Amino acid sequence: MSIEFKNVDYIYAPGTPFQTQGLTNISFKIRSGSFVAIAGHTGSGKSTLMQHFDGLLLPSKGSVTIADKSITSNTSSKSLKEIRKKVGLVFQFPESQLFEETVLKDVMFGPLNFGFSEQKAKEQAIQWIRKVGLSEQVMNKSPFELSGGQMRRVAIAGVMAYEPDILCLDEPAAGLDPEGQKQMFDIFKNYQREGHTVILISHNMDDISQYADDMLVLEHGHLIKHASPKEVFSDPDWLKKHFLDEPATSKFARKLEKGGFQFSEMPLTVDSLVNEITTKLKSKGGNE
């Protein structure tokens, strides 16, 4: 399911002394079934942008089109329910979207809200509680008794349980150990492979280079680049200018290049780095 922004502005507290420009003239299109990363330093407008995907925020100017439904400044709350069934948001702080008495009830809430039967909602909830790596022992606990990492998993399960066409994630791996982070990102990547669109906000360029196939870069509420991660990360000077880190893999590869190692193309993932080095060494060995 595709998303298109056309000349979107967003203004916080318009007409008051606290008026602030959140987004300025944002235009882009996200392909259906893609894995898109949104990057930018703190305060660049990433979370503001994401909240436009399901109408939590309405554009002050311009339009957002999702599944042939247009969202503008005049869109009513009633007309947003169909869009919100198709777009799931996982916020940066999971406690902000947990509220039920038990984990099971919390994860069931989304499916029930969007028309699932009680039995189907329970089946979906149990399935996704397991998928995100939680044991059934937590199902009858209050979500607020859990650790931060467990709460994040519950929040993710609660959105994925109604299987939205578009999944939006704001720093979803924060608070998880490396194994937990990989487990979550493998779930998100598999969800994309099943035909869904996944949108990720992250400060972690390694995650972006590993999983995303498209990338939006924001700065002070402006979209300054829309390209593949390969293109964005190909220019370390541009990254430095805009206060973005380079993925650890390509940073290491550039050090190897300074030592005389030549890459056919700059690797962005550990697998591509290892494959490139292995191929070069085998080729060199065969020529000796």
From Swiss-Prot:
EC number(s) reported in the record: 7.-.-.-
Signal peptide range in chain numbering: none
Major location (coarse): membrane
Ranges where the ABC transporter domain occurs: 3-245
Binding locations of ATP: 40-47
Gene3D superfamilies: P-loop containing nucleotide triphosphate hydrolases
Function per UniProt: ATP-binding (A) component of a common energy-coupling factor (ECF) ABC-transporter complex. Unlike classic ABC transporters this ECF transporter provides the energy necessary to transport a number of different substrates.
Keyword terms of this UniProt record: ATP-binding, Cell membrane, Membrane, Nucleotide-binding, Translocase, Transport
Name of the gene this protein is made from: ecfA2
Segments passing through the bilayer: none
Molecular function terms from GO: ATP binding; ATP hydrolysis activity; ATPase-coupled transmembrane transporter activity
Locations listed in the record: Cell membrane
GO cellular component, one term: ATP-binding cassette (ABC) transporter complex
Alphabetical list of PROSITE patterns matching this protein: ABC_TRANSPORTER_1 (PS00211), ABC_TRANSPORTER_2 (PS50893), CBIO (PS51246)
Top-level class of the enzyme under EC nomenclature: translocase
Superkingdom field: Bacteria
Membrane topology note: Peripheral membrane protein
Pfam families: ABC_tran (PF00005)
Family: Belongs to the ABC transporter superfamily. Energy-coupling factor EcfA family.
Quaternary organization: Forms a stable energy-coupling factor (ECF) transporter complex composed of 2 membrane-embedded substrate-binding proteins (S component), 2 ATP-binding proteins (A component) and 2 transmembrane proteins (T component).
Protein known as: Energy-coupling factor transporter ATP-binding protein EcfA2
